[in-house]
UniProtKB/Swiss-Prot annotation:
Gene Ontology annotations for the cellular component aspect, listed alphabetically: cytoplasm; plasma membrane
Region annotated Domain IV, binds dsDNA, chain positions: 323-442
Role, per record: Plays an essential role in the initiation and regulation of chromosomal replication. ATP-DnaA binds to the origin of replication (oriC) to initiate formation of the DNA replication initiation complex once per cell cycle. Binds the DnaA box (a 9 base pair repeat at the origin) and separates the double-stranded (ds)DNA. Forms a right-handed helical filament on oriC DNA; dsDNA binds to the exterior of the filament while single-stranded (ss)DNA is stabiized in the filament's interior.
Gene field: dnaA
Chain positions covered by the region annotation Domain II: 75-104
Name of the protein in its database record: Chromosomal replication initiator protein DnaA
Keyword Transport: no
Domain III, AAA+ region as annotated region, ranges: 105-322
Amino acid sequence: MDAWPRCLERLEAEFPPEDVHTWLKPLQAEDRGDSIVLYAPNAFIVDQVRERYLPRIRELLAYFAGNGEVALAVGSRPRAPEPAPAAAAVPSAPQAAPMVPFAGNLDSHYTFANFVEGRSNQLGLAAAIQAAQRPGDRAHNPLLLYGSTGLGKTHLMFAAGNALRQANPAAKVMYLRSEQFFSAMIRALQDKAMDQFKRQFQQIDALLIDDIQFFAGKDRTQEEFFHTFNALFDGRQQIILTCDRYPREVEGLEPRLKSRLAWGLSVAIDPPDFETRAAIVLAKARERGAEIPDDVAFLIAKKMRSNVRDLEGALNTLVARANFTGRSITVEFAQETLRDLLRAQQQAIGIPNIQKTVADYYGLQMKDLLSKRRTRSLARPRQVAMALAKELTEHSLPEIGDAFAGRDHTTVLHACRQIRTLMEADGKLREDWEKLIRKLSE
């Protein structure tokens, strides 16, 4: 049909070339008069087209063909009937549609070059680079990146996949969100196409799956992923996964799957510190072609402490209002523009919330955490809570001391220094600190 090539040409102008090549060019169109059917070689492509492109395809086909009714199906476009031969012939068996190697769904924008490194993510960055340079190496296969949302886990995953493709353009790298794996498996079960579902994974060089915590409680999904994992691991194909917490903390994940995930390298991605947050704001501003003064970047970094997405949201709001009003971006302009956002951020992480989170984490009563008792089981969690209050809020040392049953500001200062010193040598305390930071940043 003429409308589909014209539609595809318009889509090529609107979407990244790799996306068009991966998801849209494999489609074959059949005009049925009252509707148009787009055939995809496998269920993965059907799911992606339905989720990401179908509304725009309907708009374009309605414009070019006067018909916006579009259906998606797995298979290939039926051939036009051929003239019957003069002599009867025995019909041949229909040929199955050939499997098309999965080309991957990688966002090419995310690279190692534009990832801002800091103390909170430097180990994750190093691990992702190693996985891209030596895919399948048992030292980092699987590579599991875990931490709260918006900290850069998916950026590192995409960057590793893009680096793999850059080193070997023929490499087949598959990226899926966990719910896409689940949806594709359900569709394959309904279509009695599990063999095709499994073959997709046999053809790839690297598998990247986001947010595996959503596998929890889905027994059949975990069963299929378990076998997929084993096949890829045995074939030395690289596996990179993300999770919002350490997998052993995810209720509903099968013990054998948790064991498999521990075979390689697991790395925590923590909320960025002040210096990293400021560097991220400046880097994101440059990407947008916006010039912002350092003191504005420092303001945003000081106030927005939870994750990178919040930093980007604040920056986008600031740049958009500056463009709309024609005003220069200054500290005063930023404070005015982001006033409500900054107030909400401060309310989300307050000293009472920190105290309750620390008390719950260590199994303490709030009255004990705030008491004058100085036993080690109480003093250490109390010091951690004070240090977190200094790290995550704008309160002064005297204000923090007042919130802890009227303690002196020198007690708070000592607690902050003590915790910082102890974390250098005490791995368990460092782990507690990082877990509490993640909980408070969620």
